[in-house]
Amino acid sequence: MLIHPQFDPVALELGPLAIHWYGLTYLVAFGLFLWLASLRVQHSPFRETGWTRRDVEDLLFYGVLGVIIGGRLGYVLFYKPGYYAAHPLEVFEVWKGGMAFHGGLLGVIGAMALFARTRGRRWLEVTDLIAPCVPTGLASGRIGNFINGELWGRAADPSLPWAMVYPQSGSEIPRHPSPLYQFALEGLLLFVVLWLYARKPRATGQVSGAFLVGYGVLRFIAEYFREPDGFLGLLALGMSMGQWLCVPMVAAGVALWVWAGRRA
């Protein structure tokens, strides 16, 4: 059995400026996106349609806005609507934490639609470009969660070699290190599968559909090891909010994949 190291959340202090590990994981995520998306635009079908490195940089700008705005609004609406209805100004206090992946996904989808419209490109062409690059950012974020000692898992069998006690949880119960599970599933595994899948010619929209299905299924599985949010607990059918949000995500992914294949 292991004990969470309780890392200092501040990686570096430069005078009055404190640089947090979680912020650095975002920088790593953005850097990986630039690198991987730049590789993708060098190959078919994006090379033939005139994609450039500058397009990728602009795409990142749109994506960052989508992640921040969508992630925050998703947390507010999906997880704590009552609280923020009573404290509306706190919606803007992003530095206090509170982001939701599913909201961030919707924000990015909207941002990609706006980018596609301003550049005269097909929306699904844009989402197909970025889909295989996203899991590395998710992996980076989960490392940030682990360093911060947050989003710990449900109680685990003490005999499990990697069961971990989180002192910050207020108990000595051994738990699953769920951020590391999500790092492996939604990050590394999903990246490898999508990157290999996208290397072959696919109908426009199928890579995006594969991402929705892949993430939804893997997140659904990971949620069984993650402690539900204390203010929500488990919902209908013993499922967490994260799992319920994955259900329409997987359904949309399957529908998109089938529709794109028939339309090709």
Swiss-Prot record:
It is a multi-pass membrane protein. GO terms for biological process: lipoprotein biosynthetic process. It is found in: Cell inner membrane. InterPro entries: Lgt (IPR001640). Keywords: Cell inner membrane, Cell membrane, Membrane, Transferase, Transmembrane, Transmembrane helix. The chain crosses the membrane at residues 17-37, 59-79, 95-115, 205-225, 241-261. It holds the Pfam family LGT. One of its GO terms (cellular component) is plasma membrane. A 1,2-diacyl-sn-glycero-3-phospho-(1'-sn-glycerol) binds at R142. One of its GO terms (molecular function) is phosphatidylglycerol-prolipoprotein diacylglyceryl transferase activity. Its EC number is 2.5.1.145. Pathway: Protein modification; lipoprotein biosynthesis (diacylglyceryl transfer). HAMAP family: Lgt. Catalyzes the transfer of the diacylglyceryl group from phosphatidylglycerol to the sulfhydryl group of the N-terminal cysteine of a prolipoprotein, the first step in the formation of mature lipoproteins. Belongs to the Lgt family. This is Phosphatidylglycerol--prolipoprotein diacylglyceryl transferase. It comes from Methylibium petroleiphilum (strain ATCC BAA-1232 / LMG 22953 / PM1). The gene is lgt.
